Regions:
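Catalytic cores of alpha/beta
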Residues: 1-5, 23, 43-55, 74-75, ...
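Active-site beta-loop-alpha junctions enriched in small/polar residues
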Residues: 16-20, 41-43, 63-65, 88-92, ...
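Hydrophobic faces of well-ordered beta-strands that scaffold small-molecule active sites
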Residues: 13-14, 36-39, 58-60, 85-88, ...
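Flexible C-terminal active-site loop/helix
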Residues: 88-137
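Active-site-adjacent C-terminal substructures of enzyme catalytic domains
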Residues: 50-90
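Oxyanion-binding "anion nests"
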Residues: 26-29, 36-42
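Anion (oxyanion) recognition and catalysis
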Residues: 30, 79, 104
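Metal-dependent enolase-superfamily TIM-barrel catalytic cores that perform enediolate-based chemistry
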Residues: 1-32
């Protein structure tokens, strides 16, 4: 399947195996034609080092990492290890998405559309305009 995704110009695969399957993930990492990005595997700073060698990059979610400082430190460490960085989210308000967007200069990819999944967002801090994250005044 990953080979097919590569042929379809997919950019990466986000954690295709359960986080407990470490040996299997190591095997896949050595053979995959696409970068594999850790998601459920990591939440905090020590997890970045554990992901090194198993994954090509990490998906940092602000709500899982306990906040801006830890997420920033995770991104800096991942880049120092020559890993790709993705800033992601869960279903969150645009207030949380706006905070996560502040880290996007450190990221190779940003997947910050969780606020689009809620109908009663109390905030108006970020919109997706023509495929780009736009922070409002």
């Amino acid at each position: 399947m990953i080979q097919w995704l590569s042929e379809q110009n997919c950019l990466f695969v986000e954690q295709p195996m359960p986080k407990e399957k470490i040996d299997e993930q190591a095997w896949l990492h050595e053979r995959a034609p696409l970068p594999i990005i850790a998601d459920e595997f990591l939440q905090r700073m020590p997890d970045v080092r554990r992901a090194y060698g198993l994954y090509d990059g990490i998906n940092i979610k602000l709500m899982k990492s306990t906040g801006m400082r830890e997420a920033y430190r995770m991104a800096i460490l991942a880049r120092a290890l020559d890993m790709k960085v993705m800033i992601g989210c869960m279903t969150e308000t645009s207030c949380a998405i706006s905070a996560a967007a502040q880290l996007s200069p450190l990221a190779h990819w940003a997947d910050l559309d969780g606020n689009l999944l809620i109908s009663n967002d109390l905030f108006d801090g970020v919109k997706i305009v023509k495929g780009k994250i736009t922070l409002l005044d």
